Amino acid sequence: MKDNRRGFLKKGTSLAAALSLGAVGASAATNNTNTAMAPAQKVAWPVVEGADTPKMTMNVGYNDMSSKVRAIKQFGADYVHMDAPALPWTVEKIQAIVDRFKAEGLSIINHRIVLPPSILHNMAGRDEDIKNVQDAIRITGKVGIPVIEYNFYSHRLREGYYNSVGRGNARYLSFDYNRKMPNPADNNWNEPHDRKADEMAFAASELKATAAEPATSEEQFWENITYFLKAIIPVAEQSNVKMALHPNDPPPPLSRGSAQPMGSFAGWKKLLAIVDSPANGMTFDCGVSTEIGENAIEVLHYMAARNRINHMHFRNVKVETPRIKYTETYPDAGQVNMFAVMQELVRAKYKYGVFAEHPPGNIIDKERGGDFIGYIYNQAYARGVLQSVLTLEQGYKG
């Protein structure tokens, strides 16, 4: 496997050089000895994106204005995903959203639901709320949306995030489980945090649970998610809908006292085994896979071989200490081989969404507001990688 992967990387490098130079051939070097110019190669163009290839998607709000929606289409995305309206739904309500985007040439490939505390913590009303999720799955299938994404955690440790400086003074988002934050305004960016004033002297690792987000033990987590999955996955199978659980991000060992089983590869494997079905899948995030100290390609292999990747987040990181300290970077500036990730997706015939998320902050977005330019950069980068991989697979003979 290592030899095959090394060979692929050499071919990928040759292809990238050929495409960037507009060349039809490339010179090669073996054992530090120059060889003759290789014969001209025919590159199939345009590349074919179809039913069995990854689909670039961008995030929207279901009420977004048509100008933003059209800009997304102009920049090369044919698919979108979004936070879904609060449950419960009607078919008519969700169909109207689907039709609105369809009129702009965009298909909804995934929508995210927020699970209520009753499901996460086994509180009163759990079965009624699970019924609402089951109904939402049926409606999702009826309107033709293939994937529902969801989280299953008591608390997301945003308090460990802070902003660091990247290339050209870009704003990178960093995480440090042990970092103390005495002042929320310790830099010029709007630092994400949700600390109370009396918590500022503590590290994120020292924060305690709150009444609104009670601590959950690992045993309680597995009991609650097992109950949930056994209730909803059969409905998803019947409705031709795939469920995609997003792993813990950030993935520290504890988050305000709550266990974080979805912050480890072992936990992901255990999740997929609860109900052995392609409908019981995950959002594969090559960034999170690296944050927890795993090889993103190996994680991808494991999940793809079992047909459990139902959504994909395409981003890069630099990790100092797995699960504890890392920085999110531009996609071309981290430690993950993004070309290799995309090639493995293509070879696995992955056919759902690829979202190039978490763009670093840039000066244009800072001056104009929002983060649209950052997302367009990430989208263009990922689209270029996808087209390079598809060209390699479909027509380039290096």
Regions found by a protein language model. Name each.
Residues 61-72, 129-137, 295-301:
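Short, acidic/polar
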Residues 2-53, 119-122, 138-146, 159, ...:
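Histidine-acidic metal/acid-base catalytic patches
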Residues 83-223, 238, 288, 346, ...:
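Structural motif corresponding to the early beta-alpha repeats
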Residues 71-78, 95-102, 276, 301-305:
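Short, surface-exposed basic-aromatic patches at helix termini and helix-loop junctions that form
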Residues 64-83, 143:
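Catalytic domains of carbohydrate-active enzymes, especially glycoside hydrolases
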Residues 58-62, 84, 110-113, 150-152, ...:
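A cross-domain feature marking catalytic cores of carbohydrate-active enzymes
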